[in-house]
């Protein structure tokens, strides 16, 4: 799954420039019901600005409340350490950054440094749904020993009993025993028959 196929392209984004006031940033976020927006100008990506960051800054720095939101520019408080990825990177890399960097999006920048778009948490959830084939077919969850041939054995049972595999995911349950959970989405009119054959073959059904 390439990033370019799931990113929100730059021409569909609402952005703000580094020299704009933080009041303008707040107004844009309020108007569009956003929690954060990218900071960019032309093809250059600078970072992100969020409501939380603005409010925290304002209440820490303006205790006398005499200063105004118009007194400060976006570049003075924006987050500049937003991770970037290439359009041809895999979505797994974007998911990793979103998890470990605590950001609302990952910026997509090409090899020339041109800002192309962003990858959001929503995009990751969508790809996760597609990967697992949710809302498609029937779900079969099997506990199998981590030994060679188990996957081949399962798929053979399914195909021999008029089943079509939509998706196949192997999950490590982090247990003390050497087993894996295999989650399969199957398109079939013989689901019960497949269940029985899987059980007869020694697999445990979850």
Predicted feature descriptions by range:
Residues 29:
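OB-fold/S1-family RNA-binding modules
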Residues 1-12, 50-86, 90-100, 111, ...:
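Tandem CBS (Bateman) regulatory domains
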Residues 176-182:
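A short, glycine/Asx- and small/polar-enriched loop/turn
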Residues 16-18, 35-49, 85-86, 104-119:
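Cytosolic beta-strand hydrophobic patch enriched in CBS
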């Amino acid at each position: 799954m390439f990033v370019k196929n799931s990113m929100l392209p730059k021409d569909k984004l609402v952005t703000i420039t580094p020299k704009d006031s933080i009041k303008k940033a707040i107004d844009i976020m309020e108007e569009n019901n956003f929690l954060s927006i990218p900071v960019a100008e032309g093809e250059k990506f600078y970072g992100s600005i969020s409501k939380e960051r603005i409010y925290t800054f304002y209440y820490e720095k303006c205790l006398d409340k005499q200063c105004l939101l118009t007194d400060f520019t976006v570049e003075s408080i924006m987050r500049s350490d937003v991770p970037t990825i290439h359009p041809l990177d895999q979505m797994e890399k974007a998911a990793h950054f979103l998890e470990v960097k605590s950001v609302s999006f990952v910026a997509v920048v090409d090899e020339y440094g041109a800002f192309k778009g962003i990858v959001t948490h929503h995009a990751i959830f969508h790809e996760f749904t597609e990967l697992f084939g949710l809302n498609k077919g029937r779900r079969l969850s099997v506990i199998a020993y981590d030994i060679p041939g188990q996957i081949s054995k399962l798929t053979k049972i399914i195909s021999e009993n008029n089943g079509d595999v939509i998706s196949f995911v192997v999950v490590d349950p982090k247990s003390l025993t050497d087993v894996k959970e295999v989650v399969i989405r199957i398109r079939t009119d013989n689901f019960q028959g497949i269940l029985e054959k899987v059980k007869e073959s020694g697999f445990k059904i979850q």
